[in-house]
Curated annotation (Swiss-Prot):
Organism the protein comes from: Xylella fastidiosa (strain M23)
Biological process terms in GO annotation: CMP-keto-3-deoxy-D-manno-octulosonic acid biosynthetic process; lipopolysaccharide biosynthetic process
Enzyme class: transferase
Name the UniProt record assigns to this protein: 3-deoxy-manno-octulosonate cytidylyltransferase
Reactions accelerated catalytically: 3-deoxy-alpha-D-manno-oct-2-ulosonate + CTP = CMP-3-deoxy-beta-D-manno-octulosonate + diphosphate
InterPro entries per UniProt: Cytidylyl_trans, KdsB, Nucleotide-diphossugar_trans
Gene Ontology terms, MF aspect: 3-deoxy-manno-octulosonate cytidylyltransferase activity
Annotated function: Activates KDO (a required 8-carbon sugar) for incorporation into bacterial lipopolysaccharide in Gram-negative bacteria.
Pathway: Nucleotide-sugar biosynthesis; CMP-3-deoxy-D-manno-octulosonate biosynthesis; CMP-3-deoxy-D-manno-octulosonate from 3-deoxy-D-manno-octulosonate and CTP: step 1/1; Bacterial outer membrane biogenesis; lipopolysaccharide biosynthesis
Length: 257
């Protein structure tokens, strides 16, 4: 897969009322708000534009101090981050063919090369959306519901995403929780690329049963019959920050750099 740089913009959905870590975007990481860390990582990619989409004035005010980062004040009724970014795309006035990379607001260590790679993957595929995955080699990750797993077809497209360990090894997991060489098991990296036009189509899709059960917005795309291209990336993506424990680990990782 070519990793040539293609034009793209980065949009970061950010909401204050995260259930597992309230006020997450403004939590301090290395003495600075988490949203600052994520936005500056986006700026380092060479993106044409970087936007933060939020419905909270506290987040908007925090981002306003960052040079080169735009803020879109969005409605507080959106069901998912992608719905929020669709409104951001309208506010920004992006043409339908503009490649939009959805960088989650809890990914302060996302490698710039990986962000560029997901844009390139969309450009070179016939899928409606592109995303990244990395292999799982730790049992604690495989069975952690906060780490999303996925399975792909032989064409490198997603078949399903789940918080459960998929595929389930019927013979092995009955007696042990250790991954086996029959994998690889894949961890989904919460990084997406699609064009601005598809973002608008996404808002017309009704959340399906699978999305509601798993609480995973990408399942809406699959349930509606669209395709998601997947690249297994060699770049190291630390897990996102979802809990106070994750934040403590991120703080330690920052200190060790």
């Amino acid at each position: 897969m070519s990793l040539e740089i293609v034009p793209f913009v980065v949009a970061i959905p950010a909401r204050f009322s995260a259930s597992r870590l309230p006020g997450k975007p403004l939590r301090l990481l290395g003495g600075r708000p988490l949203i600052h860390r994520v936005a500056e990582r986006a700026l380092s990619t060479g993106a044409r534009e970087v936007w933060v989409a939020t419905d909270d004035v506290r987040i908007a005010e925090a981002v306003a101090s960052l040079d080169g980062v735009h803020v879109a004040m969005t409605a507080n009724t959106h069901l998912s981050g992608s719905d929020r970014l669709a409104e951001c795309a309208r506010i920004a006035g992006w043409d339908p063919e503009v490649c939009v990379v959805n960088l989650q607001g809890d990914e302060p260590f996302a490698p710039a090369a990986g962000i560029r790679a997901v844009a390139a993957l969309l450009h070179h595929s016939n899928a409606d959306m592109a995303t990244l995955a990395t292999t799982i080699d730790k049992s604690e990750d495989l069975f952690n519901p906060n780490i999303v797993k996925l399975v792909c077809n032989t064409h490198g497209e997603a078949l399903y995403f789940s918080r459960a360990p998929i595929p389930w090894n019927r013979d092995t997991f009955a007696t042990t929780r250790e991954p086996t060489p029959l994998g690889p098991w894949l961890r989904h990296i919460g990084l997406y690329a699609c064009n601005a036009g598809f973002l608008q189509r996404f808002t017309t899709m009704q959340p399906g049963t699978l999305e509601q059960i798993e609480s995973l917005e990408q399942l809406r795309v699959l349930e509606a019959g669209h395709r998601i291209a997947v690249r297994i990336t060699p770049e190291h993506f630390p897990p996102g920050i979802d809990t106070p424990e994750d934040l403590a680990k991120a703080e330690k990782a920052l200190e060790d750099v």
